[in-house]
Design a protein with these regions (language model features):
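Mobile-element integrase/transposase regions
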Residues: 1-11, 17, 33, 150
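Active-site beta-loop-alpha junctions of metal-dependent nucleic acid enzymes
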Residues: 3-6, 21-45
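Hydrophobic (often cysteine-bearing) scaffold residues that line and stabilize catalytic clefts
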Residues: 7, 31, 53, 61, ...
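Acidic/histidine-rich, metal-coordinating catalytic segments
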Residues: 26, 44-62, 80-82, 134-139
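RNase H-like polynucleotidyl transferase catalytic core
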Residues: 51-56, 70-89, 105-108
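C-terminal domain-tail junction helix/linker
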Residues: 70-74, 95-150
Length: 150
């Protein structure tokens, strides 16, 4: 039986490089830890997070979320309620993710499906052509990755 999975997604607005974690919940504690992990992951790739645009879920309205953003030097912004178009990049990515990973084949378990996520994300970020990137993969737009020119 396939279980419930909450995908916490962070996408760089310029490059479209995606960071995703699959969790069993969408609590404020989980959301803030994902944000911390994503900020560190992007920093390792030469990207400094300055702003974060989130929907209006309760975890993103919490004091903990705002305090975490302050601690990380990030300005939190919210989408307009009931207007998913405000966060169109994430919405479109989730459709691509659903088609290319979540429902691309029959998985025998949620654990098996989650186990395939990192491989699919690598493909998406490093190999899959993206129209917003001139039919290059998102990672091709990151030009200051530490160690890239050594």
């Amino acid at each position: 039986m396939i279980g419930t999975c909450y995908l916490h997604t962070v996408i760089d607005d310029y490059s479209r490089v995606a960071y995703v974690e699959a969790h069993d919940d969408e609590t404020k504690e989980t959301a803030t830890q994902v944000l911390r992990n994503a900020v560190a992951w992007f920093a390792e790739r030469g990207v400094t997070v300055q702003r974060v645009l989130s929907d209006n879920g309760s975890c993103y309205k919490s004091h903990l979320w705002h305090q975490t953003c302050t601690d990380l030097g990030i300005t939190p912004k919210k989408t307009r309620p009931y207007r998913p178009q405000t966060n169109g990049k994430i919405e479109r990515f989730h459709r691509t993710l659903a088609d290319g990973w979540a429902y691309a084949r029959c998985y025998t378990s949620e654990a098996e499906r989650r186990g395939e996520l990192d491989g699919w994300l690598h493909y998406y970020n490093h190999h899959r052509p993206h129209t917003a990137c001139g039919n290059q993969p998102p990672f091709s737009r990151l030009i200051n990755v530490p160690g890239q020119y050594i």
